[in-house]
């Protein structure tokens, strides 16, 4: 049954390469269509290939976490808070580096195995070049918040996931990380992700703001606001 679904999904993806009308399919979204074409033409990925994501060896994962230790420290409490706001909804909250490697994951212990089977574990490389269209990897390429819902994924093995991701930038506009909320539940609709996406965006902005303050903690910072009580001093 899974193989039949993967085969149908692969055929749907391949219609993009043929330039056929996809006005009613997942690729009717321009960002999805662009991503599917990148996966086919630039990365030469197979949408029907069902293998687990590449995982960094332990030493390299530790190095990656050390490079972003300050971001991980700042993001930890925000990720826990975000997970609590989504409590009971079957979500995993993930933080990756700028390459798409998962550096932290917050989820309910009872649901950890579900997300591990989906390939969402520490050290997994979810870059678009490796895993095709997905919340993390496509967010990195597009440099904007987005939701990838089920069949909008490139690989058939990922079509059980719904992922809402937001980029995290440093004070100089460089991509630092991606904050992602993923669900493996079938009942999750795309419309329901509007609320989730808003929460992810807010959390990503909070991480950016805290990182900005930490980065310039030895500098004078000027705050301006039309209302004095909103300056935050």
Identify the residue ranges that each predicted region occupies.
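Tandem CBS (Bateman) regulatory domains
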Residues: 130-135
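Intrinsically disordered, low-complexity terminal regulatory regions
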Residues: 1-127, 138, 144-147, 160-161, ...
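A short beta-turn/loop motif at secondary-structure boundaries
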Residues: 153-157
């Amino acid at each position: 049954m899974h193989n039949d679904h993967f085969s149908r999904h692969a055929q749907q993806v391949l219609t993009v390469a043929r330039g056929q009308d996809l006005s009613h399919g997942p690729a009717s979204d321009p960002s999805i269509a662009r991503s599917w074409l990148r996966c086919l033409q630039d990365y030469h990925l197979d949408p029907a290939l069902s293998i687990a994501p590449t995982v960094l060896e332990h030493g390299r994962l530790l190095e990656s976490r050390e490079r972003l230790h300050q971001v991980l420290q700042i993001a930890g409490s925000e990720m826990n808070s975000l997970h609590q706001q989504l409590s009971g909804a079957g979500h995993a909250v993930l933080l990756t580096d700028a390459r798409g490697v998962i550096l932290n994951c917050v989820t309910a212990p009872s649901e950890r195995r579900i997300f591990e089977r989906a390939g969402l574990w520490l050290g997994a490389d979810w870059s678009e070049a490796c895993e095709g269209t997905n919340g993390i990897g496509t967010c990195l390429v597009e440099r904007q918040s987005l939701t990838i819902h089920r069949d909008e994924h490139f690989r058939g093995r990922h079509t059980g996931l719904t992922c809402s991701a937001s980029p995290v930038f440093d004070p100089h506009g460089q991509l630092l990380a991606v904050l992602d909320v993923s669900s493996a539940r079938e009942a999750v609709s795309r419309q329901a992700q509007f609320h989730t996406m808003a929460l992810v965006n807010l959390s990503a902005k909070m991480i950016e703001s805290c990182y900005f303050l930490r980065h310039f903690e030895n500098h004078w910072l000027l705050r301006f606001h039309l209302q004095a009580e909103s300056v935050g001093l």
